[in-house]
């Protein structure tokens, strides 16, 4: 059963915003108490967060569809709906997030680093929030916006200081097992290591991580063997260690040719690996022929500029010198890195109030309107409510959409689409028509709020009659 997965395709969906509520305050002796509909709740976000305890993407391999909860709708009594709960997805340190086209969206390195993969939709406004001095009793509310949906690719690149590279069965897993407390699978056959293994090494006051990468063979950079699949784990390492087998039983191999082949594969792969500090480890010197071969090839390797160490992972020979030499290289690599300054957090809200829009006449005679505001307003409109449709028409008119349509040559009855081709609202354009004006006048205005109430008028009439009667009584003069 697979226990390590370093590349998955994930489908994330944020929660939709809750709909606003259209209601009227009801109380005894107050038949027209005014609008009191609450706003809808915000939809939950989908957030990827680095968790140091997570080492694989296996969970997302089995469950690739993840979604956050929707916001709750608003209620009467000015009660807003509850926000949807954010969905937090833990990922390993070193996870790279890409879109399906291969563009890098985020590179998550460091515990707690996060990325919002899908943003929740905003909740719709209730009619209480839509009320104004001119629009005292809106009979509608705005709908919640749908949440984002995105297909992303998660790719894990191991974060380690040192990478052990070499042919299969060169002894990389044995070496990492004796240098650290890691317990990789070790066996006497090629490709025993199928997944990268990480270990922590302490050398004096220096602590560093070391990665055992699955064996490479000729053509690994073109996809042969397992190398191409795992070469990405070498990209983040500061130091490369060539582990060469001095006791191989294959007649056509020797440490120098193995080194040349692995170097060629690293060069072909790219990723800036050519500039990494390198070290050569001649392993298995506990074997008599291995010791002789190591002493034979060492001068040639040193002539190329490599630091060479003769070790035996099985017999624990030369390990202390190797660990301290690696610590020295890691320390130099860390010192050479630019000092990380504290990140200045700048909050830049999403520009959802961009007033810009375009009107384009398409070949089929349809006028298409594109813009942040018009498209957002369309998503928030309940087209089953005539008053809401009229409110949308008023907003588009004030924004200048009608004027631009006229400039583009639109006439009454022409088709107008607002939004992209795959999700647009299409209607026949009627300029300067105020939908529902014959009933309500200004959009959302209720004349009943301005007219005298019958009960109050009767009370005033009765009071006037009593005042007149009292005045007549006071003015009465007996005979």
From Swiss-Prot:
<feature type="region of interest" description="Disordered">
    <location>
        <begin position="440"/>
        <end position="479"/>
    </location>
</feature>
<dbReference type="Pfam" id="PF09269">
    <property type="entry name" value="DUF1967"/>
</dbReference>
<dbReference type="InterPro" id="IPR036346">
    <property type="entry name" value="GTP-bd_prot_GTP1/OBG_C_sf"/>
</dbReference>
<dbReference type="InterPro" id="IPR015349">
    <property type="entry name" value="OCT_dom"/>
</dbReference>
<keyword id="KW-0378">Hydrolase</keyword>
<dbReference type="GO" id="GO:0003924">
    <property type="term" value="F:GTPase activity"/>
</dbReference>
<feature type="binding site">
    <location>
        <begin position="166"/>
        <end position="173"/>
    </location>
    <ligand>
        <name>GTP</name>
    </ligand>
</feature>
<feature type="region of interest" description="Disordered">
    <location>
        <begin position="61"/>
        <end position="87"/>
    </location>
</feature>
<feature type="binding site">
    <location>
        <begin position="283"/>
        <end position="286"/>
    </location>
    <ligand>
        <name>GTP</name>
    </ligand>
</feature>
<keyword id="KW-0342">GTP-binding</keyword>
<feature type="compositionally biased region" description="Acidic residues">
    <location>
        <begin position="470"/>
        <end position="479"/>
    </location>
</feature>
<comment type="subunit">
    <text>Monomer.</text>
</comment>
<keyword id="KW-0547">Nucleotide-binding</keyword>
<dbReference type="GO" id="GO:0042254">
    <property type="term" value="P:ribosome biogenesis"/>
</dbReference>
<feature type="binding site">
    <location>
        <begin position="312"/>
        <end position="314"/>
    </location>
    <ligand>
        <name>GTP</name>
    </ligand>
</feature>
<dbReference type="InterPro" id="IPR027417">
    <property type="entry name" value="P-loop_NTPase"/>
</dbReference>
<feature type="binding site">
    <location>
        <begin position="191"/>
        <end position="195"/>
    </location>
    <ligand>
        <name>GTP</name>
    </ligand>
</feature>
<dbReference type="InterPro" id="IPR006169">
    <property type="entry name" value="GTP1_OBG_dom"/>
</dbReference>
<dbReference type="InterPro" id="IPR045086">
    <property type="entry name" value="OBG_GTPase"/>
</dbReference>
<protein>
    <recommendedName>
        <fullName>GTPase Obg</fullName>
        <ecNumber>3.6.5.-</ecNumber>
    </recommendedName>
</protein>
<feature type="binding site">
    <location>
        <begin position="212"/>
        <end position="215"/>
    </location>
    <ligand>
        <name>GTP</name>
    </ligand>
</feature>
<keyword id="KW-0479">Metal-binding</keyword>
<dbReference type="InterPro" id="IPR006074">
    <property type="entry name" value="GTP1-OBG_CS"/>
</dbReference>
<dbReference type="InterPro" id="IPR036726">
    <property type="entry name" value="GTP1_OBG_dom_sf"/>
</dbReference>
<dbReference type="InterPro" id="IPR031167">
    <property type="entry name" value="G_OBG"/>
</dbReference>
<dbReference type="Pfam" id="PF01018">
    <property type="entry name" value="GTP1_OBG"/>
</dbReference>
<feature type="domain" description="OBG-type G">
    <location>
        <begin position="160"/>
        <end position="331"/>
    </location>
</feature>
<dbReference type="GO" id="GO:0005737">
    <property type="term" value="C:cytoplasm"/>
</dbReference>
<feature type="binding site">
    <location>
        <position position="173"/>
    </location>
    <ligand>
        <name>Mg(2+)</name>
    </ligand>
</feature>
<dbReference type="Pfam" id="PF01926">
    <property type="entry name" value="MMR_HSR1"/>
</dbReference>
<keyword id="KW-0460">Magnesium</keyword>
<feature type="domain" description="Obg">
    <location>
        <begin position="2"/>
        <end position="159"/>
    </location>
</feature>
<dbReference type="GO" id="GO:0000287">
    <property type="term" value="F:magnesium ion binding"/>
</dbReference>
<feature type="compositionally biased region" description="Basic and acidic residues">
    <location>
        <begin position="440"/>
        <end position="453"/>
    </location>
</feature>
<keyword id="KW-0963">Cytoplasm</keyword>
<comment type="function">
    <text>An essential GTPase which binds GTP, GDP and possibly (p)ppGpp with moderate affinity, with high nucleotide exchange rates and a fairly low GTP hydrolysis rate. Plays a role in control of the cell cycle, stress response, ribosome biogenesis and in those bacteria that undergo differentiation, in morphogenesis control.</text>
</comment>
<dbReference type="InterPro" id="IPR006073">
    <property type="entry name" value="GTP-bd"/>
</dbReference>
<dbReference type="GO" id="GO:0005525">
    <property type="term" value="F:GTP binding"/>
</dbReference>
<comment type="similarity">
    <text>Belongs to the TRAFAC class OBG-HflX-like GTPase superfamily. OBG GTPase family.</text>
</comment>
<dbReference type="InterPro" id="IPR014100">
    <property type="entry name" value="GTP-bd_Obg/CgtA"/>
</dbReference>
<feature type="domain" description="OCT">
    <location>
        <begin position="349"/>
        <end position="431"/>
    </location>
</feature>
<feature type="binding site">
    <location>
        <position position="193"/>
    </location>
    <ligand>
        <name>Mg(2+)</name>
    </ligand>
</feature>
């Amino acid at each position: 059963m697979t226990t390590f997965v370093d590349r998955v395709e994930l489908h994330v969906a944020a929660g939709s915003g809750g709909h606003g509520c259209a209601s009227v305050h009801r109380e005894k002796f107050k038949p027209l108490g005014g609008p009191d509909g609450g706003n809808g709740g915000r939809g939950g976000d989908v957030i990827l967060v680095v968790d140091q305890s997570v080492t694989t993407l296996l969970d997302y391999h089995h469950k690739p569809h993840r979604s956050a909860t929707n916001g709750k709708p608003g209620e009467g009594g000015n009660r807003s709906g509850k926000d949807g709960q954010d969905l937090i997805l833990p990922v390993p340190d070193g996870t790279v997030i890409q879109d399906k086209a291969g563009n890098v969206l985020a590179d998550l390195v460091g515990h707690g680093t996060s990325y919002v993969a899908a943003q929740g939709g905003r909740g719709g406004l209730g009619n209480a929030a839509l009320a104004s001095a001119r629009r005292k009793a809106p009979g509608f509310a705005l709908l919640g916006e749908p949440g984002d949906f995105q297909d992303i690719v998660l790719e894990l690149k191991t974060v380690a200081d040192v990478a052990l590279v070499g042919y299969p069965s060169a002894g990389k897993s044995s070496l990492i097992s004796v240098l650290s407390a890691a317990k990789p699978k070790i066996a006497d056959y090629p490709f025993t290591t199928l997944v990268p293994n990480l270990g922590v090494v302490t050398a004096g006051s220096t602590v560093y991580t070391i990665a055992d990468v699955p064996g490479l063979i000729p053509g690994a950079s073109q996809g042969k063997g397992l190398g191409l699949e795992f070469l990405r784990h070498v990209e983040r390492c500061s130091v490369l260690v060539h582990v060469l087998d001095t006791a191989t039983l294959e007649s056509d191999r020797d440490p120098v040719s193995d080194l040349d082949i692995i170097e060629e594969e690293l060069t072909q792969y790219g990723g800036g690996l050519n500039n990494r500090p390198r070290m050569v480890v001649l392993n298995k010197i506990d074997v008599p022929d291995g010791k002789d071969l190591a002493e034979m090839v060492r001068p040639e390797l040193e002539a190329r500029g490599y630091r060479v160490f003769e070790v035996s992972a099985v017999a624990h020979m030369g390990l202390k010198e190797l660990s301290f030499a690696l610590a020295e290289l890691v320390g130099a690599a860390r010192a050479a890195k630019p000092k990380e300054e504290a990140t200045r957090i700048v909050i830049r809200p999403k520009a959802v109030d961009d007033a810009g829009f375009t009107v384009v006449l398409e070949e089929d005679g349809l006028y298409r309107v594109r813009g942040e505001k018009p498209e957002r307003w369309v998503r928030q409109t309940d087209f089953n409510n005539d008053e809401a449709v009229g409110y949308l028409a008023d907003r588009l008119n004030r924004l200048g959409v009608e004027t631009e349509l006229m400039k583009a040559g639109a006439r009454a009855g022409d088709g107008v689409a607002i939004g992209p081709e795959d999700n647009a609202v299409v209607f026949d354009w009627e300029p300067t028509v105020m939908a529902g004006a014959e009933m309500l006048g200004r959009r959302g205005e209720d004349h009943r709020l301005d007219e005298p109430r019958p009960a109050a008028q009767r009370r005033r009439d009765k009071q006037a009659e009593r005042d007149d009667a009292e005045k007549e009584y006071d003015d009465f003069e007996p005979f």
